[in-house]
Amino acid sequence: MAFSPTGELWEVEHGPRGGDELNLIEKGKNYGWPLVSFGNNYNGVPIPKPDMRPDLAAPVIYWVPVIAPGNLMFYTGNKTFPQWNGNGFISGMGTTSLNRFIFDGHGGAKAAERWNVGKRIRDVEEGPDGSLWMLEDANPGALIHVTPK
């Protein structure tokens, strides 16, 4: 979970087999798990799709196949990568990628870029200087420092 620069609370959900989600969290809403999902149970049994339950909140974005998200963070730097100020980043373990998203401040989001890192990325954080730090999910793992070229 992470708060956007505009104060919205967002969360990423590592779903079942398929159906990872990005949700805008709002008071009183039910986001469906385990009642609905865009994925299936690991044993192959289907889970009802969200459109079958209009009383439950649908995700803003969902992934099939999965990205296996590790975490979500919002970039607030204005020196190292000023063009990303206010953007969200989601680490991808299943896609071995770093994923950038643009949030509109009104409950909407869209995918902007996906960079294949070739490693399962568990976590991404902004450093004090505005660079990015990624944590590889491996044994042994590694810290990957992202700076401009």
Predicted regions and their residues:
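Blade-level signature of beta-propeller repeat domains, shared across WD40, Kelch, NHL, RCC1
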Residues: 123-149
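Conserved blade-ending motifs and adjacent loop-strand segments that build the rim/top face
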Residues: 107-128
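Beta-propeller domain segments
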Residues: 1-110, 141-142, 146-149
